[in-house]
């Protein structure tokens, strides 16, 4: 099992309500995008940290492997600036909302001191500007440990602990 980091921003509400992740197969220029292509690597049981508006707001678990699926109706109707291709990658997920969302800026200094070009954060500790990113074990462990200290919901804690077990 793997752990990923998704930047949902403008589509978080729709994806959360629908219990899925969705990304177009091609960007608006008709090219493949590494953040969209990475969706194909999500498999049943993988963990995803959900980032929206500068906060990690949930952890989700993939219910199935990624599959090809047209853009969900609610995303087409959402008031966003994005005009996506209709063909996309879809993963049904179970969201576990963080009662105490984590501001990514709260651990920015740690990320700057522990950079990794293969992770979801740039050298300045900011989330990379792409939809889906890999999350290195070291970065995942740090974020999960911080979140575990804050969360008191037993179900959310259990999911975080399960994700942490993968990082050992």
Where are these regions (language model features)?
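Short, Lys/Arg- and Gly-enriched loop/turn segments at beta-strand edges
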Residues: 55-61
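Compositionally biased, charged N-terminal/linker segments
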Residues: 1-44, 97-102, 106-109, 134-168
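Surface-exposed, flexible loop/turn segments at secondary-structure boundaries
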Residues: 11-12, 56, 68
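Short beta-strand or tight-loop elements
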Residues: 44, 58, 89
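Aromatic- and Lys/Arg-enriched surface recognition patch
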Residues: 61-137
């Amino acid at each position: 099992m793997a752990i990923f980091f998704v930047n949902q921003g403008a589509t978080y509400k729709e994806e959360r309500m629908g219990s899925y992740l969705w990304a177009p197969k091609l960007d608006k220029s008709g090219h493949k995008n590494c953040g969209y292509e990475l969706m194909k690597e999500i498999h049943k049981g993988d963990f995803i940290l959900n980032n929206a508006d500068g906060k990690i707001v949930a952890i989700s678990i993939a219910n199935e492997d990624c599959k090809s699926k047209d853009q969900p109706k609610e995303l087409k109707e959402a008031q966003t600036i994005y005009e996506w291709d209709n063909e996309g990658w879809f993963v049904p997920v179970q969201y576990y909302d963080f009662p105490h969302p984590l501001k990514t800026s709260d651990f920015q200094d740690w990320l700057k001191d522990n950079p990794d070009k293969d992770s979801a954060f740039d050298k300045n500790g900011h989330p990379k500007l792409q939809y889906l990113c890999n999350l290195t074990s070291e970065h995942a462990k740090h974020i999960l440990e911080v979140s575990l200290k804050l969360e008191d919901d037993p179900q959310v804690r259990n999911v975080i602990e399960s994700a942490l077990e993968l990082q050992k």
